Amino acid sequence: MATDLTQEFCALRDTYIEKQFGRLNDMQRQAVFTTDGPLLILAGAGSGKTTVLVNRIANIIRFGSAHGSKQTPRPATEDDIKALRNAIMTGTAAPSWLDGMLRQNAVRSWNVMAITFTNKAAGELKERLRRMLGGEEGDEVFASTFHSACVRILRRWAEEIGYPRSFTIYDTDDSQRVMKAVYKDLNVDDKFLPIKAAINQMSRWKDQLVSPEQALASPAKDTKGALTARIYAAYEKRLKEAGAFDFDDLIYQTVQLLAEHKDVRDFYQNKYRYLLVDEYQDTSVAQFRLVSLLTGPEKNICVVGDDDQSIYRFRGATIENILNFERIYPGTKTIRLEQNYRSTSNILNAANCVIQHNTERKGKTLWTSNGEGDKVQVYTAENEQDEASHIADVIGQHLKEGGHLADHAILYRMNAQSAPIESYFTRAGIPHKIVGGQRFNDRKEVKDIHSYMSIVANPRDDVRLRRIINEPARKIGATTVEVIADLAAQEGVSMLDIIGHADQYAKLSRAVMPLLKFWQIYQRLQDSLETRTLDEFAADVIELTGYKAMLEADAAKGHEDAADRLQNLGQLVNNVKNYCDQHGEEATLEGYLEDIALISDIDSYNESADQVVLMTIHSAKGLEFPYVFLIGMEEGVFPSEMSKYSEADLEEERRLAYVGITRAKKELYISNSVSRMLYGRTQRNEPSRFLQEIEPEYIEETRSSVLEQRSRFGGWGDSYRDTVPGGASGYSGPSGWGRSASGYGTGGYGSSYSNRGGYLNREYNAGEGRGFGSAYANRGQSQSGYGSGYGRSGAGTEYGSGYSSAYSDGTTQKKSAKQISFTGTPAAKTAAKGAKHYEPGDLVEHKVFGRGQVVAVKPAAGDQIVEINFEKVGIKKTMANFAPLTKITAEE
């Protein structure tokens, strides 16, 4: 009887536990309730992997391996069954006296470690765990990035490997400063071996867990290889003397610590009985080794990843880590999450079409119950400016339908592709944000104040000291700094130690006073840290160092950026206060400096700001947007030119395309261009093979109206246009201002050029000939124009009745090809004649922002800066002649 009751209780227990984790699909449920042993979760894009991670962690903590088990700590009773059945029927929590019967091998929150790749992902995981487990219990789960986890380990054990626990974390700029010193010591010519090349090689060595000693002992391929090994050893020596790690060291040194110190390794394996790793497909050799060292003898390791989204090989990621996981961890259970909750089926089918051409993959097919949705829109543009204009048109239409700017993301293969979009959007007054631009913490004034804070936290940090010892100017020159460095090296102390005793060194006699004044500032900052709150300390740093006074003096002299720099320092203090509010009593200077050192580009992305987002596809990993524009889908651009020569590189490019496609929720727009200017030269590329891999039934193709016109008249050629005053690049748009259409004659079809900017105002009109003609319309700004017509390959004297047309804000201008005229009209007058003019009170319509009223007008360089109060988006400023504005009446 007792056995029957226990079996009944176990069945009810399964039902009760399942109800605690509702709204999971079958495969997600399997992943959540598989708790013991190695587990590989192949999670497709948008398949709810974060939901699985959160629920799996909660299950491990609340119930352990109870689900599916037939065991109980004691025989079940009728009262147990009655109480549990009542909890199931009423949807309430089971009574606390049943807790022991509902748990099996459950662990405490602090026994679980979850590792993610970005602070954003870690933050989301923590927040959802707080909501599911409660604030205190959720906070005790250790969820962090790889680098943050390593910093935490090193803060406790750094002395075991010869570093102070108050170590500094160097960024790229700091590393380059160290390298310059190393190059000077070793008398290395940067032209022979660029610093960047040496840093990249050292990064690869660390990622492959190659120590300086191993690099020196390994046979070098050439002189540069041997020299780089010497530089590596000298660089690491300098970092150790400064008590600093660079970003690569954080993982490399943690691996060395765990591998060489069994007591440390045992401590973490015993503490973290369950290890979960997200984005496992992007782990490197060093990260793979770190995970294996943290995994305990029970092998309770769960990795989540998607081999189809492995896109960081250039950073050292190796897809083999996920492909070989089942071989490395025998007994692995593999679960595939293929139901997508993000996108429509047309978008997913397009993604599936592309990725199935890869051979190095586990294999899975995404599907959704979201419905077909719109087909993928593929647009062929004349050039990159036409591409930008088309995107603006689509965004404008979405806004008219009630959408928001932040719903839109423009993704590209390489950063250089963003310039035409940014330029177009700036002229059109479309709010946008480039993720991956200059970060707040990279601004000079911010880095300077952080450097002051760093030397207070770590007095051995000579690199940061060099940065600010004469900032603001204190009459401490470069020669004095080198003398200090030499003395510090001779005596085996820090540069700050020498500065504090400057009056004892004859070599420093000329600089004693400024050095001792600097030492006094340093001591006052130390006192401030000990007696004031952290945000007050930050304010003191800005004040006591003289930095604030310097910027205020610059502002008084009319320096344009001084006020902005002061505001940035005010924001820095706010950031410190926010850090204190988040961490409470645990807030420390070292902790704050860690946080800013580990911030990535995507962590600074503000999702609440209503602006169009521009970013590389690599940066967009893990994000989603209702509307995605995937631009530059051309051979040589995407896939990149170099990838064509390596099958592995080409497969990585295809995975990158798959990632880009699967960022879209509602609609996906892919564009390619007949002509594209990149890196100062115009390229003509074929459409990307990835476009051709998508089945026609999932896409809808459109082309630039100019391209359509060409094909309609059986011709070929090019059209360029530039609407930027004084600009040089080509520019065209299907419905924007400055649009150029074709010129043709009876002898064939010609190309049309329209440039606004440069020095000449020319109009050439193509005429009849046996071959094809060309039509040009250049609108310059400084010289008069002239025109002529000709047939290129026919008789030069025969002129036909073709025409050339140029559009400006919808106005068509036609000129007979028969007429050859020297107008003698100055370009400035021509421009003025077609210029727009607005007055306060004018009603206007913007193709993106909709209706608005002009509230202020300011003349500027032959144009007007127009301030408009739009009904939907409020006050915006734009240039009159280069914005998509149309005057309207109240009745319209």
What are these language model-derived features?
Residues 1-164, 169, 266, 320, ...:
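P-loop NTPase Walker
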Residues 23, 80, 88-97, 146-150, ...:
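Conserved helicase/translocase P-loop NTPase motor core
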Residues 33, 37, 104-109, 256-275, ...:
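Short basic/glycine-enriched coil/helix segment immediately N-terminal to the Walker B
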Residues 35, 117, 137-141, 158-249, ...:
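ATP-hydrolysis module of ASCE/P-loop NTPase motor domains
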Residues 47, 281-360, 364-369, 486-489, ...:
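Conserved helicase motor core of SF1/SF2 NTP-dependent helicases
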Residues 47-53, 68, 73, 77, ...:
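Helicase P-loop NTPase motor core
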Residues 217-221, 404, 418-430, 443, ...:
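Conserved helicase C-terminal RecA-like lobe
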Residues 633-874, 882-892:
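C-terminal accessory regions
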